[in-house]
Amino acid sequence: MASSANALRLGLRTCSRPTQTSNLRIAALQRRALSATATRCEGVPVPKREDDAKLEFTRPYNPGEFLSEKLRSDDLQDWERERYERALTSWEQTPDDLKRGWSTMIRDIEQAAAPLRRVVMPRRSTFWYEEEKDTDLITNEDGEDDFHENDIMSLGHGKLEEHREFREYARIAVWEMPLLSKYAKPFVPPTSEEVLRFRYTTYMGEFHPADRKVVVEFCPKDLRDLSEVQQRKLMKLAGPRYNPEKDIIKMSCEKFEHQAQNKRYLGDLIEKMIAAAKDPKDTFEDIPLDTRHHTFTKKISFPKEWLLTEERKKELEAARQQALLKDAEKVVQGALVDGADVVKQYLESGAAEALHAVPVMAGRGGKALPGGKGGKMQRSKR
């Protein structure tokens, strides 16, 4: 109970204390919602920026002044002081004309280096300092002239570049290509032992990821050391790479970086397939040849029965002559109907105007209705 009473007493004492009022600090300046300049107090002097032309730079010393300044320093060691004294003695013994030349050279260096040592003050009156010169940008204005706005567009330059490329290849075709004739070799057809036909893809003048691809084709029947059973097994091992319509196995490889590697891989793969086809353990005779991967295209040819023979040509010519003779007889008898004359006579007789549609006034109020009950277009003869 004692602890509870003490806690209650402390709580009542805290609540009975008067509330302290906090002294808020009033800002001396009025705050602005948006400002682009720093806040300044009235009466405080603003430091003025010195003009660039009034800035003074330290003039470089000549050797005599530099050595005398060094000798007046107390921080030199004995061996350093001896070295500076010898150098100062040597400078005093130098002829006056050399000293004047040295002074002239120092003056020229000072005048040339003065703009480089001048402090570049930013122009705060411009937006983003866009009028300032970029000191890091080095340009060579020798030989440059003003742009007269008379140049062609980039599309025209591209067309000219394309024309130059065509002319370059034309010069190569005229002057360099004929020189390759001395490297020409006569064509020698492949022998019966060369059954593999390799095909390569080359992009002249550029590197292309597809130029590594190598394609090989061969006919199983060209492998004379395989029997018919082994040849059929080789076709079944090739799977969808076998074309039953052309009787050719076609394979390709582009997994390696160079063409020689892909060609070597295809050669090793064909050797493994031939070795598997020669394996007498399983000849695959109980497995039919699957050709579902190939779509057979039926080539429709013109029937030989429909070809015109010499006898048929004579029969058609005789039938045409008979038809012409019959037409000539009808013309003489006046029984041949000429379609152009019939149409002309019909138009001249005026019978066509008699069949024109004439609107008949029908309906209520004496109005002609375009359609519906009582408003149909009727035909009548005049």
From Swiss-Prot:
Residues 363-375 have a biased composition (Gly residues). Pfam families: MRP-S28. Residues 363-382 are annotated as: Disordered. GO terms for biological process: mitochondrial translation. The keyword Transcription regulation does not apply. Keywords: Mitochondrion, Ribonucleoprotein, Ribosomal protein. GO terms for molecular function: structural constituent of ribosome. GO terms for cellular component: mitochondrial small ribosomal subunit. The keyword Ribosomal protein applies. It is found in: Mitochondrion. PANTHER family: MITOCHONDRIAL 28S RIBOSOMAL PROTEIN S28, SMALL RIBOSOMAL SUBUNIT PROTEIN MS35. Component of the mitochondrial small ribosomal subunit (mt-SSU). Mature N.crassa 74S mitochondrial ribosomes consist of a small (37S) and a large (54S) subunit. The 37S small subunit contains a 16S ribosomal RNA (16S mt-rRNA) and 32 different proteins. The 54S large subunit contains a 23S rRNA (23S mt-rRNA) and 42 different proteins. Belongs to the mitochondrion-specific ribosomal protein mS35 family. Component of the mitochondrial ribosome (mitoribosome), a dedicated translation machinery responsible for the synthesis of mitochondrial genome-encoded proteins, including at least some of the essential transmembrane subunits of the mitochondrial respiratory chain. The mitoribosomes are attached to the mitochondrial inner membrane and translation products are cotranslationally integrated into the membrane. This is Small ribosomal subunit protein mS35. It comes from Neurospora crassa (strain ATCC 24698 / 74-OR23-1A / CBS 708.71 / DSM 1257 / FGSC 987).
